[in-house]
């Protein structure tokens, strides 16, 4: 509950939406590539990145290259084992996952990125079984109990439909009276976006 510890995606949102830098010496604790991309975006926006700490023994070489290009220190096969600071982060303690010898890293914010997990709660409520996918590091729907099929992100397919555009479906209604929802939860239609 120390102020200054948050999800990397939240820190990126603060920077992109409000122009707020979450810190001057930020550390990322990651076990997933998405956090690296968040930190790269922050670094390009002028936020100081003290280090990337990743529990994995290896990551994509493109990530390492970009971190090097941006001057970001990377510690692979390491974990954050402690956060210091009473009213905010002042430092973290990290250790190598093999020898557990701790060392201190000064920072004023800690970002976390543990990856993405499919939302399987409704699937589980319908008594569908789950299976583990090592490539995702997550549980995904397996055998259904009801007549249900999961696709896209809820099935762990993060790129499903990336770049795809679906033409307007045929309808007998007057085209000017059709609602094309962009966001069901917030009741936003294509007309609302055009108007904005």
Task: Walk through the language-model features, giving the residues of each.
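Residues forming the flavin
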Residues: 1-196
């Amino acid at each position: 509950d120390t102020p200054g510890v948050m999800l990397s995606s939240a820190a990126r949102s603060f920077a992109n939406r409000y122009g707020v830098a979450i810190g001057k010496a930020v550390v990322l604790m990651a076990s997933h590539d998405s956090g690296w991309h968040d930190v790269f975006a922050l670094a390009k926006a002028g936020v100081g990145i003290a280090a990337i700490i990743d529990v994995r023994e290896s990551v994509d070489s493109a990530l390492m290259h970009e971190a090097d290009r941006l001057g970001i220190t990377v510690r692979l096969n390491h974990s954050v084992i402690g956060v210091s600071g009473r009213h905010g982060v002042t430092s973290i303690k990290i250790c190598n996952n093999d020898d557990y010898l701790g060392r201190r890293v000064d920072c004023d914010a800690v970002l976390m990125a543990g990856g993405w997990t499919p939302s399987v709660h409704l699937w589980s409520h319908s008594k569908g079984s789950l299976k583990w996918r090592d490539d995702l590091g997550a549980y995904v729907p397996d055998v259904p109990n009801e007549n249900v099929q999961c696709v896209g992100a809820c099935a762990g397919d993060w790129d499903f439909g990336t770049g795809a555009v679906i033409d307007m479906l045929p309808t007998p209604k007057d085209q000017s009276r059709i609602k094309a929802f962009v966001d069901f939860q917030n009741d936003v239609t294509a007309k609302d976006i055009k108007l904005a």
